[in-house]
């Protein structure tokens, strides 16, 4: 089965071209704008320059600390300013079209993005919340579809429609906080925030949407708003080498590499981008990543595929390749999806692989499979929902709005 996939992917292009560009609505949302951009919008509605810094701070607080969903909620902002903003702008986030809750507490949302082009279909992305005993992780998307064609990834089977804007990326986090009632001024169980970590591991390749991802993560990590530490934000890439160093310099978050193979021949099949940026170049970029240290280790993600990349020889070569890189290895049991050409490694083999890597001095946790009962493979909820009739989709949407 893997051989068939390899033949198919060998002929596939390394990267897809976006089918569309973003068209803003007539009344765009202020979410995702920098402080300088917010000041400019305030100037557009006649707020004097001497007041703009104060008004920006007020807006920032209401948007990202309190999670305001309308200008009317912003009671510390003058009524004239609120009215002026409401005439030209919104604070809308993506709309929840479907919500699924797993038996293990994992939540998955299908989010519809507003568009300013009546001729374009409204597009949808996925966002997943994974609660654990010591943290709550939100998995965020960066593209509608994906630039890449990774053989084992469900999103890789979808078209690349377009890049998300910074506002659409930040909006996913705000929707999750809305649904979980997790804003800073609200009570949560045990007094702790539910969303403590962000991972850019949803739909899309973040480093092929660099500027929007950078701008979004700088907003998310701002301690006067959403306030999630950069050490609790992880950006995952399949290996867009030219932008890895740039990510360290301009964003400064934790780095994860979707490695999945230790030989170029196999990685060319699993992650076709490897034909452009082979393993040696990728690992050198990791060695050069600004700020990497034992306290800020780079995570190497390794999906366990039965009979493909899970031998002890693979484990030995993995350890050899990572020598000198402050690293941990995240072993991921393959999450099957309809039509996939691979199977998950046997659990005994996963444990042997993990034990070898651990004994070589690397942390090698096996990621616990989560949300398998709710189409949790990345991109699968979107694909399955697209198959529904208009009436079925409307029913799903109504359920999501009333939950």
UniProtKB/Swiss-Prot annotation:
GO MF terms held by the record: 4 iron, 4 sulfur cluster binding; metal ion binding; rRNA (adenine(2503)-C2-)-methyltransferase activity; rRNA binding; tRNA (adenine(37)-C2)-methyltransferase activity; tRNA binding
Cleaved signal peptide residues: none
Residue ranges annotated for the Radical SAM core domain, each copy included: 132-375
Catalytic reaction annotation: adenosine(2503) in 23S rRNA + 2 reduced [2Fe-2S]-[ferredoxin] + 2 S-adenosyl-L-methionine = 2-methyladenosine(2503) in 23S rRNA + 5'-deoxyadenosine + L-methionine + 2 oxidized [2Fe-2S]-[ferredoxin] + S-adenosyl-L-homocysteine; adenosine(37) in tRNA + 2 reduced [2Fe-2S]-[ferredoxin] + 2 S-adenosyl-L-methionine = 2-methyladenosine(37) in tRNA + 5'-deoxyadenosine + L-methionine + 2 oxidized [2Fe-2S]-[ferredoxin] + S-adenosyl-L-homocysteine
Cofactor(s) needed for function: [4Fe-4S] cluster
Entry annotation: catalytic residues: 126 (proton acceptor), 378 (s-methylcysteine intermediate)
UniProt remark on cofactor binding: Binds 1 [4Fe-4S] cluster. The cluster is coordinated with 3 cysteines and an exchangeable S-adenosyl-L-methionine.
Chain residues that bind S-adenosyl-L-methionine: 204-205, 236, 258-260, 335
EC number of this enzyme: 2.1.1.192
Enzyme class of the recorded protein, top EC level: transferase
Disulfide bond sites: 139-378
GO terms for cellular component: cytoplasm
Keyword Iron among record annotations: yes
Binding-site residues for [4Fe-4S] cluster, renumbered to this chain: 146, 150, 153
SMART domains registered for this protein in UniProt: Elp3 (SM00729)
InterPro entries from the UniProt entry: Aldolase_TIM, Elp3/MiaA/NifB-like_rSAM, Methyltransferase_A, RlmN_N, RNA_MTrfase_RlmN, rRNA_lsu_MTrfase_RlmN/Cfr, rSAM
Miscellaneous information on this protein: Reaction proceeds by a ping-pong mechanism involving intermediate methylation of a conserved cysteine residue.
Function as written in the Swiss-Prot or TrEMBL entry: Specifically methylates position 2 of adenine 2503 in 23S rRNA and position 2 of adenine 37 in tRNAs. m2A2503 modification seems to play a crucial role in the proofreading step occurring at the peptidyl transferase center and thus would serve to optimize ribosomal fidelity.
Protein name per the record: Dual-specificity RNA methyltransferase RlmN
Native species: Bradyrhizobium sp. (strain ORS 278)
Encoding gene (name): rlmN
């Amino acid at each position: 089965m893997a051989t068939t996939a390899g033949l198919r992917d060998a002929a596939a292009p390394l990267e897809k071209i976006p089918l569309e560009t973003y068209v803003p609505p007539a009344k765009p949302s202020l979410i995702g704008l920098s402080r300088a951009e917010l000041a400019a919008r305030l100037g557009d509605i006649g707020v004097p320059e001497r007041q703009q810094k104060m008004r920006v701070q007020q807006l920032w607080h209401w948007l990202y600390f309190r999670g305001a969903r309308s200008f009317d909620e912003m009671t510390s902002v003058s009524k004239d300013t609120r009215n002026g903003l409401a005439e030209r702008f919104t604070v809308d986030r993506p709309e929840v079209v479907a919500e699924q809750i797993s038996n293990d507490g994992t939540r998955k949302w299908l989010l519809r993005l507003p568009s300013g082009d009546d001729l374009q279909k409204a597009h949808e992305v996925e966002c997943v919340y994974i609660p654990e005993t010591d943290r709550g992780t939100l998995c965020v998307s960066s593209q509608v579809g994906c630039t890449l064609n990774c053989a084992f990834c469900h999103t890789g089977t979808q078209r690349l429609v377009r890049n998300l804007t910074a506002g659409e990326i930040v909006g996913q986090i705000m929707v999750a906080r809305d649904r979980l009632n997790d804003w800073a001024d609200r009570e949560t169980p045990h007094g702790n925030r539910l969303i403590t970590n962000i991972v850019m591991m949803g739909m899309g390749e973040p480093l092929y949407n660099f500027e929007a991802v950078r701008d979004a993560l700088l907003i998310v990590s701002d301690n006067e708003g959403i306030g999630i530490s950069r050490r609790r934000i992880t950006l995952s890439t399949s290996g867009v080498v030219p932008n890895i160093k740039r990510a360290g310099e301009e964003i400064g978050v934790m780095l994860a590499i979707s490695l999945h193979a230790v030989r170029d021949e196999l990685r060319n099949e699993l992650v076709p981008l490897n034909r452009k940026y082979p393993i040696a170049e990728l690992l050198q970029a990791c060695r050069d990543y600004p700020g990497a240290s034992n306290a800020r280790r780079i995570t190497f993600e390794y999906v366990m595929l039965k009979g493909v990349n899970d031998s002890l020889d693979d484990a030995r070569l993995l350890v050899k390749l990572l020598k000198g890189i402050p690293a941990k290895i995240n072993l991921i049991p393959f999450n099957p999806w309809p039509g996939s050409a691979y199977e998950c490694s046997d659990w005994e083999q996963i444990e042997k692989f993990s034990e070898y890597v651990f004994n070589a001095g690397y942390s090698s946790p096996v990621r616990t499979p989560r949300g398998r009962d709710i189409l949790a493979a990345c991109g699968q909820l979107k694909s399955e929902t697209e198959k529904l009739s208009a009436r079925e989709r409307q029913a799903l949407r109504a359920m999501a709005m009333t939950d």
